[in-house]
């Protein structure tokens, strides 16, 4: 495959990493405006399976891998696909690839960016797992057709790992990122991410292996509201989260851990919250706060450690 590439960031570009609440000197809502990413890419689950055990949710209590009901897999994927269409989010559905059983979790392979000049860039991941890293070119090829140019990190190594929108999340409508590290993404890589995205990055060390990505313990609802599970974060991380989000809503371990996976919810438009069904407590809180909760069954995908947010990539 031959791809057009974005220019490499220069050393003149500023890097701004925010590691604690004291370093957050301005309100993130005052950051430069950015468009909302209101298009979804999804990968068809043709080759989805639980066979590459890379997170704790893939195993049952006895240590064996979860078995999937493949009819339910297709039904649940289609329900999520159709739920996006129903709320006005167009979906680009691409084929999975044989030998890549986790490619359906397409939030992880790339970070879509609109730079200060309006150019659409796709920052490609250096994924922790070899099989998952082999998915990256297929996602890249799909978004090149959507007028994206590619941007690359330094060569993949144990020091340069980055799992994109599994760990790196935009504050909606703002040039401001939240970045998780510790399990799949390395802290140092955010110097490069900040440069190429032309955005400050608030950093969060993830300390609970059951919440291996930032998107498993934090769901950003809008620019002042988020839901989060506290045991995934350090105390400084929680203080920083509370400073960024005036309305930070806690999620219990029961609903955040599998099979609830509530913090892997997705609110694409500041109104509709797509979330695994049955999370009674957090769903009630969100409804009382004025959000429209769309409950969906994703339990077959949770057997592999992902739910709504993992199953799509939002792009501009």
List each language-model region with its residue ranges:
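The feature marks the mature, well-folded catalytic cores of soluble enzymes
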Residues: 1-316
């Amino acid at each position: 495959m031959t791809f057009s590439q974005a220019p490499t960031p220069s050393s003149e570009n500023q890097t701004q990493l925010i590691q604690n609440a004291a370093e957050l000197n301005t309100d993130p809502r005052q950051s430069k405006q950015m468009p909302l990413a209101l298009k979804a890419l999804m990968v068809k689950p043709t080759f989805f399976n639980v066979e590459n055990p890379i997170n704790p949710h893939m195993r049952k209590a006895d240590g064996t891998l979860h078995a999937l009901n493949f009819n339910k897999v297709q039904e649940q994927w289609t329900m999520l696909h159709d739920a996006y269409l129903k709320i006005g989010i167009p979906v680009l559905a691409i084929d999975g690839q044989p030998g890549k059983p986790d490619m359906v979790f397409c939030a992880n392979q790339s970070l879509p960016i609109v730079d200060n000049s309006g150019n659409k860039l796709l920052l490609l991941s250096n994924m922790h797992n070899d099989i998952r890293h082999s998915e990256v070119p297929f996602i890249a090829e799909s978004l090149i057709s959507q007028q994206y140019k590619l941007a690359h990190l330094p060569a993949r190594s144990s020091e340069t790992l980055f799992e994109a929108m599994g760990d790196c999340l935009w504050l909606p409508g703002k040039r401001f990122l939240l970045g998780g590290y510790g399990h799949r993404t390395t802290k140092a890589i955010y110097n490069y991410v900040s440069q190429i995205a032309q955005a400050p990055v608030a950093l969060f060390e993830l300390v609970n292996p059951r919440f291996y990505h930032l998107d498993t313990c934090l769901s950003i609802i809008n620019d002042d509201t988020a839901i989060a599970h506290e045991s995934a974060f350090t105390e400084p991380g929680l203080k920083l989260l509370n400073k960024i989000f005036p309305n930070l809503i806690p999620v219990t371990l029961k609903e955040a851990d599998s099979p609830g996976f509530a913090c892997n919810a997705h609110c694409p438009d500041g109104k509709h919250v797509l979330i695994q069904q049955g999370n009674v407590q957090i769903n009630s809180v969100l409804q009382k706060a004025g959000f429209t909760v769309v409950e969906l069954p994703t339990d077959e995908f949770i057997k592999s450690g992902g739910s709504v947010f993992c199953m799509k990539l939002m792009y501009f």
